[in-house]
């Protein structure tokens, strides 16, 4: 196996019932492995019955209704257990896993494990988070920092945004493109890059908190923990 994390790269994404990581439920999930050219070589897909109503707003984003999840989805506990198992197996193989805005997906997965009386994923590392990388490498670029915009900036096709598989694969390809554009900063050993992202995310959150306190709410707080909050 290559020493470059971006030559064989895991990718992961969730679609869920909402934005609160403590209370939202997994609706669909995708894990894949990309080769050095961004081609998909392995994949796992899940559709879950979250056990609760999927809000209309969430369904509008990812296209999965409560009715479909109940009819076609598997029990949440089974899905969560399998996701944790596959992620753990990728880390055991020495692969890094790309997750765009990792604290959302990994924190939600952590709370889903607890909710279903499962052991949470152990230390998830190494993680590659293109959102953190993009903010660190191109700090002053104007515009949104969504996956859709990042894909456009780094020349990656994203034709079905908010589908777990499309988002996961695009995030991985963005990470690969960034590593090739900025090798001095990003083409380093995966665990070293993981540690750098811990520091970068803390700095980014502190800057955002300072901005919000100056311009909107003097009591605003945000967590800089990464990759799990």
Positions of PLM-derived features:
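DEDD superfamily 3′-5′ metal-dependent exonuclease/proofreading module
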Residues: 1-27, 34-42, 64, 70-229
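Residues at the C-termini of beta-strands that transition into short coil/loop
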Residues: 30, 47-50, 131
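Short, surface-exposed acidic-centric catalytic microdomains
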Residues: 42-62
């Amino acid at each position: 196996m290559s020493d470059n994390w971006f030559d064989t790269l895991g990718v992961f994404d969730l679609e869920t019932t909402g934005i609160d990581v403590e209370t939202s439920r997994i609706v669909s999930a995708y894990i894949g492995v990309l080769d050095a050219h961004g081609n998909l070589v392995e994949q796992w897909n899940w559709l879950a019955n979250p056990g609760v109503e999927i809000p209309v707003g969430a369904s509008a984003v990812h296209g999965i209704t409560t009715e479909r999840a109940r009819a076609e989805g598997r029990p949440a506990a089974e899905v969560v257990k399998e996701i944790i198992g596959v992620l753990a197996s990728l880390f055991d193989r020495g692969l890094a896993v790309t997750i765009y805005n990792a604290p959302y997906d990994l924190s939600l997965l952590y709370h889903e494990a607890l909710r279903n009386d499962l052991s949470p994923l152990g230390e998830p590392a190494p993680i590659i988070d293109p959102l953190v990388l993009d903010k660190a490498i191109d700090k002053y670029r104007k515009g949104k920092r969504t996956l859709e915009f990042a894909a456009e900036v780094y020349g990656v096709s994203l034709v079905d945004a908010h589908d777990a598989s499309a988002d996961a694969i695009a995030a991985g390809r963005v990470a690969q493109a960034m590593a090739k554009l900025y090798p001095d900063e990003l083409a380093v050993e995966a665990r070293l890059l993981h540690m750098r992202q811990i520091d970068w995310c803390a700095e980014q959150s502190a800057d955002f908190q300072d901005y919000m306190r100056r311009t909107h709410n003097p009591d605003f707080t945000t967590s800089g923990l990464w990759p799990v909050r």
